[in-house]
Each structure stands twice: as structure tokens, then as C-alpha cells.
């Protein structure tokens, strides 16, 4: 098959522009590594994980794939600093943030060579993510699962 090249494949170093959602309770290392091994971008859903559980999932994902994968991290959690420390220590290269202000952690993550993508529910929040230095955004509609915005039209 011919290589598929676009901004998404180039940004993440993946074969296909397919990004698996970082779903709380569902996106563990098995799913993320399978998606990454298939040429997409697997994402660990860290929202339901304590930092030590996240570390275990990252290590198992690394053992199961040599392809890029990321972590989805809701920013509203109380132990966010511990999660971020784990991500940095485990040398995760891609982080999707959501449910919070990306300006709080984006610069810190980028200082460690991490590509940062923020999930937004409106153009207003996309502009804020851009101003915070995020590398990309995911536009999420009201119909989306998880933490979504108050915009009822998408």
C-alpha cells in the first residue's frame, strides 16, 4: 500500500490518519498498542487511572509496540501534577489534554519534547488552545462522549 501522508501522519509519525479516542475505562494498553501497531495513533485514557496505574499502562504499551502512542489526560483531576510527572518520566511523546485550561500545562509538556493536542468544544476554545501553544486541537461536538462543552450545535 502506498504511504498516506498528511499533516496528521507527519505530526504523530503514524502510517494512517486514524486516532483512537482516549476513552476513560476503555482505552488501556491493549487497545492503544493494537491501534498503534495497525498504523494509527493509540491513546491511553488516563482519566480513570491513578498515576501508578498509568505508569503500568505506559510501560505495557511500550512493550507491546514500537510505534507512537499517546495519553489522554483530563486536566481537571486533583493529582494532575503526578500524572504529568509520570508521563514525562516514562517519556511519552504525545499527550491529548481535555476538560481544563491548556495554558496551565502545555508549555511544561512541550519543554519535555511532548506534542500537545487539546480537545475543544468551540472555536473560542480552539483559539485559546492555539494561544497556549498546543500543536493541534480535536474539535468535539455536543454529541461526543466524556466531558464536552455547552455548545448545543456542532
Regions found by a protein language model. Name each.
Residues 1-154:
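Active-site entrance/lid segments in N-terminal catalytic domains of soluble metabolic enzymes
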